């Protein structure tokens, strides 16, 4: 009986030790980057207010094509401003807090996308 208890205790300790090596639940994501194409042309922007699901820690790539320079405002913590020139640029961001992040053009007074971070 003592031998059984000793073996059971050793197995229980080993399992507890192994579970401590698991995922810490951080904000990293193994998901592929979320690609969002943003086009500014003739005073208009697309997309226009779409809601897009994003995982915490997932890379989000904004591919911005514009016919003139401008700025995108990202209402995250901390807030971010993405300045772009005429032509095409790529901006890579990650969000580690759950919630809705609005991405907008202040010049056009328009929400481009709402990122649903979960």
Annotated model-derived regions:
Residues 80-82:
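A short beta-strand motif characteristic of beta-propeller blades
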């Amino acid at each position: 009986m003592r031998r059984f208890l000793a073996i059971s205790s050793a197995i229980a300790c080993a399992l507890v030790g192994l579970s401590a090596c698991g995922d810490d639940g951080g904000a990293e994501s193994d998901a592929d980057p979320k690609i969002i194409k943003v086009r500014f042309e003739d005073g208009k922007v697309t997309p226009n207010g779409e809601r897009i699901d994003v995982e915490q820690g997932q890379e989000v790539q904004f591919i911005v094509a514009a016919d003139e320079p401008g700025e995108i405002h990202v209402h995250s913590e901390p807030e971010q401003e993405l300045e772009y020139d005429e032509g095409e640029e790529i901006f890579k961001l990650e969000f580690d807090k759950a919630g809705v992040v609005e991405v907008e053009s202040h010049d056009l007074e328009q929400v481009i996308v709402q990122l649903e971070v979960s």
